[in-house]
Amino acid sequence: MSAFCRDCLADARAGAKRCATCGSLRLLAHDELDSLAIAHMDCDAFYAAIEKRDNPELRDKPVIVGGGSRRGVVSTACYVARIDGVRSAMPMFKALELCPKAVVIKPNFAKYTAAAKAIRGMMLELTPQVEPLSLDEAFLDLSGTQMLHGLAPAKLMARLAKRIEIEVGITVSIGLSFNKFLAKLASELDKPRGFAVIGEAEAVAFLRDKPVGFIRGAGAALQARLAKDGITHIGQIQDMAAKDLARRYGNTGLWLHHLAHAQDSRKVDPDGELKSISSETTFDTNIAKFEDLEAVLWRQAERVSARAKASGHGGRTVVLKLKTAGFRTRTRSVSLDSPTQLADRIFRTAREALRREADGTAFRLLGVGISQLAPDTDCDPADLVDDGSAKRAATERAMDKVRAKFGGEAVVKGRAARSALRR
């Protein structure tokens, strides 16, 4: 059995409790440690971790990052808040009922994207096969990298985690396995600051006693349907023939059969997964006036732009989303001549759609996004017709640099200030 220290990377004796070189208790041991190459890395409570990094007084306090109003939602909760049951996407009023002493912080996407970009760069130093899932998580295929770096994938990931702690100031959790399904599952087993391994020899047995919900993508509706048929654990799926599962559940049944047997043929795809980038907010009170909606739209466009720039993408389509006071959703899409990642262009495009929708109807939610993503090298070419577009683009990129260095509120456009006054 192979074993090493996650702190100094020194090899360790199997069964040892402490590193003989540095004294660390963080030893990792597994029979397949030297051969597994598919990793999933997830930043621990990312937004909250960045806020705690920048404000040491928050270190031991329950921190919630999200909309500051009771009608908002939780973006991220730190692990102290999670002890009280607070979870991402939970309504803020519910989170504060569970954790009334929580410190609520509005998101600072300029800060988060700067950290994400730094981490992404570190990943790419190890392998070009990095598939981002969001700002704070990604798959890595480290096959063949040992010849380049002189370390097995497991040690490369441990070294990466340590480097992120030192240079970015946050912790990450890592899962290592032989396919994406199990690597992601492994990364969730030992949070925070964890490193878990699921080998090929143990995978099917490991899954056997796990609830069906452990299968990524088996949502509440599918779980309820399976439970109605008496299927609550993965082992029950393993015991069924593929043809019986297909007959009962169609293609979903075959998908369940493969994953229950630890089979996942998906490759780590640097261009995969990310299909759109969006941001939305729920208002404290319903808004009907165009001018008020316009100010909120700018703030959301800035957030989408920041995420797009961090991911290295732009979008060919701008999408506006509105939800009425009666919970009816309106979605409008506008196609562009060339993809964009600029907040100004996203805002101007969505504003025209908003102008047509702002007919006196009271809205409780507004969102904007981009889809049909393209690499940032294809985004925002010089506009020979609109002389002002180049100046606006240059101004925006200058503002990005200031915000990344001094924080998201270092430079605020008039539109954003009006948005803050109206909230």
What are these regions (language model features)?
Residues 1-2, 31-32, 40, 207, ...:
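DNA-contacting surface of Y-family translesion DNA polymerases
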Residues 223, 336-423:
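Acidic, metal-coordinating catalytic segment for phosphate/diphosphate chemistry
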Residues 176-181, 259-262, 314-325, 363-374, ...:
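A glycine-rich phosphate-binding loop feature that marks nucleotide/adenosyl-phosphate handling sites
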Residues 99-101, 142, 323-326, 377:
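Short acidic-glycine loop/turn motifs at beta-strand connectors
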Residues 68, 89-92, 188, 266, ...:
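N-proximal short alpha-helices
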Residues 44-46, 69-72, 325-329, 373-376:
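Short, charged/polar surface micro-motifs in flexible loops or helix N-caps
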Residues 104, 328-333, 377-380:
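Short small-residue beta-strand/loop micro-motif enriched in glycine and branched aliphatics
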Residues 1-256, 268, 306, 389-423:
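Gly/Gly-Pro- and Ser/Thr-rich, intrinsically disordered tail segments characteristic of DNA damage-repair
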